[in-house]
A protein has these predicted regions:
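Conserved pre-ATP/AMP-binding loop-to-beta segment of ANL
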Residues: 11-31, 64-65
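Conserved AMP-binding A3 loop
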Residues: 27-54, 61-63
């Protein structure tokens, strides 16, 4: 059920469309974000949606009539699944129009945000998250700076690992206590020939999925090093942009990403791409991080990054 809609008819229409699809279709459709390729439509059976919703509820210990909050786009899997969980599990859902910094004006048992939303909330209203008992993060890695700030809030914060193809999260990590992801019920992880993660989910009866994520396994879990298609080899050394970005996020406040350019000596040289202009950033700002040969050799400034509809930065080589 919907407890209230804070943003008018657009979110009410979105919920009504999802509810109609649930009541009238044998399968439920989800659109990928397009951050790693051409957007596509993926379908799941109602039984798979129900089992996914129940697994989430079990993990977070959420009962019928739980008060939950969402400010995610309804067109993609994270937002759509919040609405479907509310339908299946009889939650009271407050659904706010997507924004960079959602407004929390009540108390909630559970909420789902992107890492970018939480970072902006911490900057604008550091105590707002205290009104929520449990928070699920997704939509991209959490910066080290944001993770440190989250240790000061009372909320239980979890980062989910998953994608549209897995019907949202298949692994979780407690941001305050764990450095690695642990599989949810029925999920098994193995490593492919290229060091990439392979997912098997007997709980949802999904076929084995070979991802492009490069992972490092440890007891009971794994860490994500980066994506296979983003790896940079510079001077014969392999670098993962995502891992470097987590370190750099300690000191770089504006949006950025790591890329590479051809180099006669190194093959590829690492470059830092920053949103803004030359007045906003100087390379010496990161000297104390001791990045060694992984330090960017050049900074490229772009007035505005291209982003997906869900807010993810589109990397451009």
């Amino acid at each position: 059920m919907i407890n209230k809609i804070l943003s008018g008819s657009d979110m009410q229409d979105a919920y009504s469309a999802i509810e109609s699809e649930w009541n009238n279709s044998e399968v439920i459709s989800f659109q990928t974000s397009g951050s790693t390729g051409v957007p596509e439509i993926i379908t799941f059976t109602k039984e798979q949606v129900i089992r996914s919703a129940k697994r989430t509820a079990d993990f977070f210990d959420l009962k019928e009539n739980a008060e939950v909050f969402c400010a995610l786009p309804p067109v993609y899997v994270a937002g759509k699944m919040m609405a479907l969980r509310a339908i299946v599990l009889h939650w009271n859902l407050t659904w706010q129009s997507p924004s960079g910094s959602p407004i929390i004006d009540s108390t909630y048992d559970f909420a789902a945000f992107t890492s970018q939303q939480v970072s902006q909330m911490l900057a604008s209203s550091p105590t707002a998250l205290n009104a929520i008992q449990k928070v699920l993060l997704g939509g991209g890695p959490l910066s080290e700076r944001a993770a440190a700030l989250l240790r000061n809030v009372s909320t239980n914060i979890f980062e989910g690992y998953g994608m549209t193809e897995t019907l949202t999260h298949v692994a979780m990590r407690n941001v305050k206590e764990q450095l690695f992801f642990r599989p949810l019920k029925g999920v098994q992880f193995t490593q492919g020939e290229k060091g990439n993660l392979v997912i098997e989910d007997s709980w949802l009866n999904l076929p084995a999925l070979e991802t492009n994520d490069i992972v490092e396994f440890m007891k009971d879990g794994f860490t994500v090093m980066g994506r296979l298609d983003n790896v940079i080899i510079s001077g014969g050394v392999k670098f993962f942009p995502e891992e470097m970005e987590r370190r750099l996020s300690q000191v770089i406040l504006q949006p950025f990403y790591i890329s590479s350019m051809p180099d006669e000596v190194l093959g590829q040289k690492i470059v830092l791409v920053v949103e803004g202009d030359t007045q906003d950033f100087q390379l010496k700002k990161i000297d104390h991080l001791n990045l060694g040969i992984g330090k960017p050799r050049e900074v490229i400034f772009k007035p505005k990054f291209n982003r997906t509809d869900s807010g993810k930065i589109i990397r451009e080589s």
